[in-house]
Amino acid sequence: MIQETIVITQNSSGLAHIAPMGIHIPAEAQDEFIILPFRPSTTLNNLLESKTAVINYCDDVRVFAGCLTGRRDWPLKPAEKINGQVLACALAHTEVELVRVEDDETRPKLFCKAVHTANHAPFKGFNRAQYSVLEAAILISRLNMIPLEKIQTEIDYLRIGLEKTAGDRELEAWGWLMTVIENHIAKEGVYAGNLPGAGSAISKEGVNAASQSGTGAAKAGIGS
């Protein structure tokens, strides 16, 4: 199973790096987690250096969308058992240690074991708008790999659930993502069509963050 999470690593100077990532959880070992960051990436470098990470379970989709649109500054607090940082808005988190590495030229497999798990707030149920934002974020991470027509079709479908069920946080996150798409279309010189819900303009760094695997994108889920 793959769970969409927020992975926080830090370097030897204590600088935290926040990255949305799809974490693989083997059915036969629920205390084992496989993290697959692309090479090169900050997450990979930090994990190999520190041998630790924090996996955060979060229902605030602004964190996922924010990391893909140049908004990586989210409140953190110290981890409890390892030298690391926890997302302050996480519903729960798991602190892990690196056990072994299966190397790969593109995407190494980092096998980690849980050393501590804590719950912070109750999970209040599934929400279609949150799903829409997560799926849109994955599309954003693949802007340079997917035809714009397909992106438009997917966005039109995801917007249905968003418009019916979104709260303020989901609408804000959606707006950030739509702005990235519009900026990408403008950069490519293609007619934008009727992409909805654009938020405030963001920098070119934000667009780059959505299209480079080293800063937030992944080809199977979201990752960095």
Language-model-detected regions and their locations in the chain:
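Basic, polyanion-binding surface patches
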Residues: 1-93, 97-199, 222-224
